[in-house]
C-alpha cells in the first residue's frame, strides 16, 4: 500500500476500501544504496529514488520492472477549494439539452465551504503493455492505452478504481472520489 499527502498527517477517516491489517503483515527488508532505498519482500521490490521520491516496482524473483513512476515528477498535488452553490429558485425553468429536458436555475451565490487536494500520480507503462479495468463503461474498447477516461458513477457507467496490467500487476486507487485516467505518448497519469 502506497499513501501520499502534502499535509503533515493524513486528513479525514479514509474510505472503506482499504482497511488496516493487524495480522499477516508482509515481511520485508530495507536496503540503502547511493540515492536509493529499496524495500524487498520475497515477491516484490519497491525502489524509492531519494531525490525525486519516484517509485519503481519490480518482481523480486525475476528482477523484471512491473511499473515505474515518471522520474522527473512522479506525483503532484494542488489545493482546491470546495463550494456550495446556492441557486435562485425564482429563476427555475426548463431547457432542452442533449440528455433531454432539464430543469435549471441561475446561480445566486457560491460559498466556499472547505478545501481538498487534487492529486496526480504519473506513470510510465512498458512498451506493449495493455491496461484494463476501471469499471463498466459504454466505450467500444477494452485496452485503456492511449485513452482518457473520466471515472464517476453515472446511469450508464460504473466506476471501479482498479487498473489491471498484462505486465502482471494491478492497482487499486482508494480515493473515494471521481477520477481521471489519461495515457498519452510520453506517460500516463491517474488524477484523484
Enumerate the language-model features and the residues they cover:
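A low-complexity, Ser/Thr/Gly/Pro-enriched, surface-exposed linker/loop concept
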Residues: 1-39, 75-78
